[in-house]
């Protein structure tokens, strides 16, 4: 098992308050359309988010990895997790914006955002940062029946 998958399995065995979203969620659990360089783990509770440093430490001990905190803000934390010759970026976010689709799918231990929610998030991301990866994800979502125009108004 590669570091990314092993990290996800261990992370979500420690918490049910977070969910995976973004490009990695789309690639690993829905469409397998591109490689994503980071894991976006979101929480919707400040109390649960406050526990993330301990969760990361426990997970890294469990899987034999090391971690470095690269950014540490009240609602955003970025970690580099490394083992042997693999390194992944783990972004943890306290999501203060209400979820339009609060239910999540579960694959094994991993809670994963719904494609519908990710369409809305990708539309908002396009307006804010205009990165190619967001266009690729939106194209893939559209090609798989999640039409962006349908979600534009609620974005």
Regions found by a protein language model. Name each.
Residues 1-155:
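Compositionally biased terminal segments of proteins
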């Amino acid at each position: 098992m590669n570091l990314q998958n092993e990290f996800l399995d261990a992370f979500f065995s420690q918490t049910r308050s977070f969910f995976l979203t973004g490009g990695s969620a789309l690639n690993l659990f829905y469409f397998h359309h591109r490689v994503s360089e980071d894991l976006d783990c979101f929480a919707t509770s400040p109390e649960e988010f406050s526990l993330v440093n301990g969760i990361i430490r426990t997970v890294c001990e469990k899987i034999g990895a090391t971690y470095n905190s690269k950014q540490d803000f009240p609602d955003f934390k970025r970690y580099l997790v490394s083992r042997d010759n693999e390194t992944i970026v783990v972004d943890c976010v306290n999501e203060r914006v209400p979820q339009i689709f609060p239910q999540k799918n579960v694959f094994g231990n991993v809670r994963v955002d719904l494609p519908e929610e990710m369409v809305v998030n990708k539309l908002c991301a396009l307006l804010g940062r205009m990165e190619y990866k967001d266009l690729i994800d939106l194209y893939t979502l559209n090609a798989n029946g999640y039409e962006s125009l349908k979600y534009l108004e609620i974005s």
